[in-house]
């Protein structure tokens, strides 16, 4: 074998010339203690608050406490592979999640990782989960309605785009159902929907995803799930992750709706973390900044000014009460932050009034500004009529002989209560709502038996769709009732009653 010395020397010279010394430095620390999803780390001197640290086994942790000689880190996953003395690396990244159209139709965890088995997420952009809410100058007053498809809400506690409307009530009163209905009602509206499940059973989240898929709503919806089996830090961060994904549309001049189900469980997860981080407890053992926990989240829902594109983010936070106690710490906090609340009552739910909305305690602080003129015209007296009905119904229990006027109010009130009942997952379009409200408030339903009210409202809509679809079109385009429309509706309802009443007398 012949060795060419000149060739070897040329190769060696080339390698010497091309040699570049690369020094990589990473700041590392050591785990002092770990347990219950919280680690104490020593040695990461220049770490930032909310920075991600890398633990053994590619486990990420989020820095929450910056102390004199160590940092408190919330672990975003299973901590069984972490032990005392483990090495921790700084990543230099603040907790961020993927945003954009790639997340639509997916079920993700709060880190933005897919849970639905539909392959990897092809998102090109990431945004930090903790951002500042829009300032006063950046906002515009709310004026566009966000139709939920639920008659009782759209008529009496209307929600506008950019509003925060709290859904509050005991367990098993239909809080999630109202929010799912609101998502289903956005099918034609171009609103991007986000459902954040916090501390829910995995089976419940699967059921919600299945319901949305069946109704074709997953095409414009994203689910962010931190289930009951996930560590507390993931449950704590999930609303912020969902909010960041939804803000992408708000900041691009589009409209988004986000449901937080529910913030009571997020507060419990935050309390658990805070106590493990040895932060001083306050009322009900919650830390002192639990109000700020929810206010900084809900303030990010806004209607932006025209200069910033006029986009909006509407929030429907859910709070679960214990035995109807709305004066507990978390419920009062969230009530004071939001622009109104829909209060659900177990007594109404058990009596078959579903959705079980207590109209007297429910309120929208945006009110008529978020309602179309047509809806205002037909539902203006409704809240008062129902309030009077309740008062008279309570009084009528003690009195047998009632005058004609009282009797009429009681009869109409009972029909209104019946009319506002609605089956699950069947949101109504706004023009259809206007028609049935018109029939009820103008007294056209007074002679229809109470147990036929639902049937009549269905028949009436079908009749108008078949015989005079122009009415629905006009309500939709004009968004107000004029004399001509009034007359057309009156004629249509009268004609429909002529065919409906004989059928039900047989």
From Swiss-Prot:
Subcellular location field: Cell membrane
UniProt site positions, description: Required for activity: 362
Binding sites annotated in the UniProt record for ATP: 169-176
GO cellular component, one term: plasma membrane
SUPFAM superfamilies linked: C-terminal domain of alpha and beta subunits of F1 ATP synthase, N-terminal domain of alpha and beta subunits of F1 ATP synthase, P-loop containing nucleoside triphosphate hydrolases
Reaction equations catalysed: ATP + H2O + 4 H(+)(in) = ADP + phosphate + 5 H(+)(out)
Reported function: Produces ATP from ADP in the presence of a proton gradient across the membrane. The alpha chain is a regulatory subunit.
Xref: PANTHER family: ATP SYNTHASE SUBUNIT ALPHA, MITOCHONDRIAL
The protein's name in its UniProt record: ATP synthase subunit alpha
Species annotation: Lawsonia intracellularis (strain PHE/MN1-00)
Gene responsible for this protein: atpA
């Amino acid at each position: 074998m012949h060795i060419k010395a000149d060739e070897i020397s040329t190769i060696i010279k080339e390698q010497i010339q091309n040699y570049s010394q690369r020094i990589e430095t990473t700041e590392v620390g050591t785990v002092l203690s770990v347990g219950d999803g919280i680690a104490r780390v020593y040695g990461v001197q220049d770490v930032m608050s909310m920075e991600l640290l890398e633990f053994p086994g590619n486990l990420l942790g989020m820095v929450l406490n910056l102390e004199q000689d160590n940092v408190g880190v919330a672990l975003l996953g299973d901590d069984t592979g972490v032990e005392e003395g483990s090495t921790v690396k700084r990543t230099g990244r603040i907790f961020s999640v993927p945003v954009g159209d790639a997340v639509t139709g997916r079920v993700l965890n709060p880190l933005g990782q897919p849970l639905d088995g539909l392959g990897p997420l092809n998102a090109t952009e990431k945004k930090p989960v903790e951002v500042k809410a829009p300032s006063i100058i950046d906002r515009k007053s709310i004026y566009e309605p966000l139709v939920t498809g639920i008659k009782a809400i759209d008529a009496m506690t209307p929600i506008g785009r950019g509003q925060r409307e709290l859904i509050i009530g005991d367990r098993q009163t239909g809080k999630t159902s109202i929010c799912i209905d609101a998502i289903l009602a956005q099918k034609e509206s171009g609103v991007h929907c986000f459902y954040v499940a916090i501390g829910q059973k995995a089976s419940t989240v699967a059921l919600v995803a299945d319901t949305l898929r069946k109704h074709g709503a997953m095409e414009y919806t994203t689910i962010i799930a931190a289930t009951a089996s996930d560590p507390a830090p993931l449950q704590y961060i999930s609303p912020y992750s969902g909010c960041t994904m939804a803000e992408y549309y708000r900041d691009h001049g589009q409209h988004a709706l986000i449901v937080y189900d529910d913030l009571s469980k997020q507060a419990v997860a935050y309390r658990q973390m805070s106590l493990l981080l040895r932060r001083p407890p306050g009322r009900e053992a919650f830390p002192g900044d639990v109000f700020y926990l929810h206010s900084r989240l809900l303030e990010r829902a806004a209607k932006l000014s025209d200069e910033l594109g006029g986009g909006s983010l509407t929030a429907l936070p859910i709070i679960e009460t214990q035995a109807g106690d709305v004066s507990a710490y978390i419920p009062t906090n969230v009530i004071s932050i939001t622009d109104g609340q829909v209060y659900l009552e177990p007594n109404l739910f058990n009596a078959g009034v579903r959705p079980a909305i207590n109209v007297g305690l429910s309120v929208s602080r945006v009110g008529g500004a978020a309602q179309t003129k047509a809806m205002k015209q037909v539902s203006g007296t409704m809240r008062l009529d129902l309030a009077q009905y309740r008062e008279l119904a309570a009084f009528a229990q003690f009195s047998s002989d009632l005058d004609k006027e009282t009797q009429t109010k009681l009869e109409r009130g009972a029909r209104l209560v019946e009319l506002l009942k609605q089956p699950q997952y069947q949101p109504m379009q706004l023009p259809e709502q206007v028609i049935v409200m018109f029939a009820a408030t103008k007294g056209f339903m007074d002679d229809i038996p109470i147990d036929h009210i639902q049937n009549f409202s269905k028949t009436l809509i079908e009749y108008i769709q078949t015989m005079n679809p122009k009415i629905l079109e006009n309500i939709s385009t004009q968004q107000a009732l004029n004399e001509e429309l009034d007359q057309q509706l009156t004629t249509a309802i009268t004609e429909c009653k002529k065919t409906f009443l004989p059928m039900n007398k047989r």
